[in-house]
């Protein structure tokens, strides 16, 4: 059995997952929370976006299960583990990890993108576009590439479609009520009847399964999105970057919420000098340039790691600490907007009759804020959280581009864009690294924004149907 390794970001991400599950169970037991989510469930576009988000979340969670593999021990004693820390996603994608080339190669290429030194049988050395070691290496004749790609794509798509068909059958069986015939259930799904848009959900899931099956079957024989300067598969780097984007978007929110909720409600409820102090605090914090503050924090972290190397023996642990520190700094600097919103809403709620009655009856201030004010501002919290998520994912890419983001050894879309900056200036242009980062980031941000729009419409009292 491998030895599990719990990085700080792993612990926090699973803590956040547990909090989400607990909130879901709590919401199912309370009608006033269940009703808005029921409205979200009726939105076809939101459910399609949720399917895409679940794919990203699944990849991120698999990449958050870290371990050290057990080394082979013939004697059966003194069990030892490898020094390298790998994730469950690394084990699943092991064929892609081990298939590194020498340097650049274009998508689906069989030859290198740049000329390399090759030694001839007579001892001479020449510069040529040599065959790749893994990409299309199974082809005896490179001219067979087009037909081979089409055949493997069709085979992978069929496998994905078969898995999707099993999923559809399972959904149909679970959707049956009483003695309903399966044909009747299938008819309701096909015509989009019922509160839950199962047709949209299943069609989106079908597209995902077919795409994953197609790409997986091709990726075992070709570099679908090419390779980078050091020969790493760009598709694999893009998939590994999902975890970084999700962590920056979620853990930053986890850090931001306590500051924003507590201080915002306190400022609006107590008013007076408490309101003045909190306003001066977030006004001063907003005046500090975020990039400069993050740069100073990252440099301070480098000094701390350099003086405490024994606490962080591996590159993965040092990179994880830098990622966690980046989330902390972003959380500390990004709570001011939500704090202002909650302060304004609390000022309005404080004048309501039920708040005045609770104060007159001698209810404690903490109890009033927890039981009467917080539930009435939760729609603002949820709306802000889902909208800020996509902005934080984009902000991480910007920070990595300017050199103050995550560690260079960490796979992230920002690091891919930063490395592609010089590649776009060369001739011929190496465009696939930038394109891959853009496509994966665009898919996550678009799905998050579409789902956020539905959540906003459902929880905003002014827009609630």
Where do the model's predicted regions map?
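Gly/Trp-centered helix-boundary motif
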Residues: 1-252, 256, 405, 409, ...
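Alpha-helical transmembrane segments of integral membrane proteins
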Residues: 45, 170-173, 201-211, 227-465
């Amino acid at each position: 059995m491998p030895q599990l390794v719990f990085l700080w970001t792993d612990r926090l991400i699973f803590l956040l997952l547990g909090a989400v599950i607990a909130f879901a169970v709590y919401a199912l037991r309370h009608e006033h929370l269940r009703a808005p989510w029921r409205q979200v469930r009726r939105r076809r576009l939101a459910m399609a976006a949720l399917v895409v988000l679940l794919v990203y979340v699944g990849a991120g969670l698999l990449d958050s299960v870290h371990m050290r593999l057990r080394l082979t021990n013939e004697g059966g004693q003194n069990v030892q583990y490898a020094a390298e820390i790998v994730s469950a996603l690394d084990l699943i994608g092991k064929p892609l990890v081990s298939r590194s080339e020498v340097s650049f190669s274009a998508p689906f290429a069989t030859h290198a993108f740049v000329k390399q030194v090759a030694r001839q049988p007579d001892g001479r050395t020449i510069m040529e576009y040599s065959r790749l070691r893994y990409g299309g290496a199974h082809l005896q004749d490179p001219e067979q590439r087009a037909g081979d790609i089409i055949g493997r794509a069709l085979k992978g798509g069929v496998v994905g479609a078969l898995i999707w068909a099993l999923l559809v059958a399972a959904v149909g069986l679970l959707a049956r009520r009483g003695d309903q015939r399966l044909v009747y259930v299938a008819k309701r799904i096909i015509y989009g009847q019922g509160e839950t848009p199962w047709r949209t959900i299943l069609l989106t899931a079908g597209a995902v399964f077919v795409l994953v099956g197609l790409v997986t079957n091709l990726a075992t024989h070709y570099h679908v999105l090419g390779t980078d300067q050091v020969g790493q598969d760009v598709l694999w780097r893009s998939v590994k970057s999902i975890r970084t984007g999700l962590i920056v978007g979620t853990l930053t929110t986890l850090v931001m919420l306590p500051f924003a909720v507590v201080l915002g409600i306190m400022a609006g409820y107590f008013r007076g000098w408490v309101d003045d102090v909190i306003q001066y605090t977030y006004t001063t914090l907003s005046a500090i340039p975020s990039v400069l503050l993050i740069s100073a924090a990252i440099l301070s972290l480098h000094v701390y790691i350099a003086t405490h190397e024994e606490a962080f023996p591996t590159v993965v642990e040092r990179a994880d600490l830098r990622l966690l520190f980046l989330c902390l700094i972003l959380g500390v600097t990004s709570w001011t907007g939500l704090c202002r919103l909650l302060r304004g809403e609390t000022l309005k709620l404080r004048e309501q009759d039920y708040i005045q009655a609770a104060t007159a009856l001698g209810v404690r201030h903490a109890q009033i804020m927890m039981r009467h004010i917080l539930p009435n501002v939760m729609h603002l919290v949820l709306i802000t959280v889902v909208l800020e998520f996509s902005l934080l994912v984009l902000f991480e890419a910007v920070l990595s581009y300017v050199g103050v983001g995550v560690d260079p050894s960490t796979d992230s879309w920002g690091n891919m864009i930063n490395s592609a900056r010089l590649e776009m200036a060369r001739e011929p242009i190496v465009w696939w690294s930038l394109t891959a980062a853009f496509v994966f980031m665009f898919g996550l941000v678009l799905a998050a924004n579409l789902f956020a729009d539905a959540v906003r419409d459902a929880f905003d009292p002014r827009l609630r149907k």
